[in-house]
Amino acid sequence: MFLKNLSLTNYRNYETMSLSFDGPIQLFIGNNAQGKTNALESIYVLALAKSHRTPRDKELISWDADYATIRSDVLRRYGSVRLELQLTTKGKRAKINGMEQQKLSAYVGALNVVMFAPEDLSIVKGAPAQRRRFIDMEIGQVSPTYLYYLSNYNKVLAQRNQLLKDLAMKKSNSLEMLAIWNTQLADLAVKLLRKRFEFIRKLETWAQEIHTGITDGRERLSLHYVNSSPVTEEMTIDQAVDKMLAAYEEVRDREIMRGSTLIGPHRDDFSLKVNNMDVQTYGSQGQQRTSALSIKLAEIELIKEEVGEYPVLLLDDVLSELDEHRQTLLLETIQDRVQTFVSTTGVEGLKHQVLQQASRFYVREGKISGER
């Protein structure tokens, strides 16, 4: 897929901005706090209807405006698609070819992106919540049903947690209602888990191959899903639901005491190991960075496998930080197949091959010029 253009209105420090793109690499050059990261972020938001930097849409809207709009014409293998996302303080409006989508889950996936930013090291060394968010965002790009299940799971989870609090405070004694929530939550949990198991397995296959190449065969990367429940990938759906229901019963008293659901996808994690060593805890910064790069490059291949075409790649202030070997591997992965947007403070440290292929955009105080 290929972004033919990008138009922003009232997005962060861009009052208005309109660009056209040609060629495989788009290079955004500027000092810090000028808006180059905002430009890349807007593409991510257009694709996923949420930012990787903040959960608050209000921060994406210019301080003196009531709304922000992102538009782009995206070339897919089946033709051109016009995407438009409007952000307001009250919600989002998403359009595909001028038709408003009633649910964001029907919109997400029209454009697939992979973002690699300095904060993506949190995939390796951050908190479990950051890795859960990574899983949810990446599966959601290629599976609208996953987003639907996740949304429903979170709604039922909130209702169940409220009932557990009421039971703890003696405001309710309805164990029958708890059983109803258990049944609904178990069914949704199993649907999410089956998708997550499959995702981690496929991601590991690609990441292992890439990591082995980066390290010249010295290291083997493995990913392991850390499950808070007794559900396993080998179980049938019925077996998994029964296991989840039994697990809820087993921890019921503790959950009532704490007023919170203690097991399920919202408590899960995944671990990364290099040569059977926990890279999150014991890995060097170099090993953690290489593991993160391997996962990001694996995402590119996994999306291609799932949707039949390569995603757009967003490299936010990371390309110049990669040594020549890692830059070479990245370039070999993308070649002319992956449209890539790069933000950087300067061209020093970038391979000549990158500069040869790149269209350059100079960013200063929310204005972009110097396209060539």
Curated annotation (Swiss-Prot):
Report the protein's function. The RecF protein is involved in DNA metabolism; it is required for DNA replication and normal SOS inducibility. RecF binds preferentially to single-stranded, linear DNA. It also seems to bind ATP.
A Pfam family (short name) is SMC_N
Q: Where does ATP bind?
A: 30-37
Q: What are the GO BP annotations of this UniProt entry?
A: DNA replication; DNA synthesis involved in DNA repair; double-strand break repair; SOS response
The species is Brevibacillus brevis (strain 47 / JCM 6285 / NBRC 100599)
Keywords in UniProt for this one? ATP-binding, Cytoplasm, DNA damage, DNA repair, DNA replication, DNA-binding, Nucleotide-binding, SOS response
**A Gene Ontology cellular-component term:** cytoplasm
MF terms from GO for this chain are:
ATP binding; single-stranded DNA binding
Please verify whether the record's keywords include ATP-binding: yes
Record's family? Belongs to the RecF family.
The places in or outside the cell where this protein is found are: Cytoplasm
Family annotation (PROSITE patterns): RECF_1, RECF_2
| Keyword ATP-binding included in the entry's annotation | yes
Q: Any stretches that span the bilayer, and where are they?
A: none
Where mainly located?
cytoplasm
Per its UniProt entry, which superkingdom is the organism in? Bacteria
Q: What's the protein name?
A: DNA replication and repair protein RecF
